[in-house]
Amino acid sequence: MSKKAEPIVIGKFGAVHGIKGWLKVHSYTDDPESIFEYKPLLMKSKGQFQEVNIADWKRHSNGFVAKIVGFDVREEAQALVGLELLVDSDKLPNLEEDFYWRDLIGCQVKTDNGYDLGVVTEIMETGSNDVLVVKANSNDAFGQKERLIPFIDKQVISNVDITSKLIQVNWEPDF
């Protein structure tokens, strides 16, 4: 991977489960079980990254619970509730003809007609589709400071070129 590896959030700890220190785990990965395959798994506590050693995990209801090494009672595990689970970005699989949402941050966005709409600063998750937040250029002819562009493949998003950091959209610049 060309970028320096940086920790990427792939899940978080939920509520404590039982009295022996088990925790609910919310996975953000495409295949939810794959969160347990990443090594090392990290958590950020008090501004510091620490390795998470999972002794065991199992399916529970619609999710998972995990037993973390060194957290043997409910009260100890309570300190982990809400902490994010991360993995170094270089541990993520390379995508041949696809990309991660994080790869879109910093991409230039242009209309199919070549108008420069600005740069992607973040991606918002909505119920129906994700939305690109595009910071407009300071000299935007339409006076826009920011644009919200739905990420709808083929209908709004014409092309994504991660190598060139360019997203081409079917979008009116004055909208």
UniProtKB/Swiss-Prot annotation:
Gene3D superfamilies registered for this protein in UniProt:
PRC-barrel domain, RimM
**What UniProt keywords are attached to this protein's entry?**
Chaperone, Cytoplasm, Ribosome biogenesis, rRNA processing
Q: Name one GO biological process term.
A: rRNA processing
Q: Where in the cell is it found?
A: Cytoplasm
Per the record, GO CC terms? cytoplasm; ribosome
Domain PRC barrel positions: 96-175
Task: Report a single Gene Ontology molecular function.
Answer: ribosome binding
Describe, as the record does, how this protein assembles with itself and its partners. Answer: Binds ribosomal protein uS19.
Task performed by this protein: An accessory protein needed during the final step in the assembly of 30S ribosomal subunit, possibly for assembly of the head region. Essential for efficient processing of 16S rRNA. May be needed both before and after RbfA during the maturation of 16S rRNA. It has affinity for free ribosomal 30S subunits but not for 70S ribosomes.
Q: Which protein family is it in?
A: Belongs to the RimM family.
Q: What is known of its domains?
A: The PRC barrel domain binds ribosomal protein uS19.
**Cross-referenced HAMAP family, in alphabetical order?**
Ribosome_mat_RimM
- Any idea what this protein is called? Ribosome maturation factor RimM
Query: Gene of origin?
Result: rimM
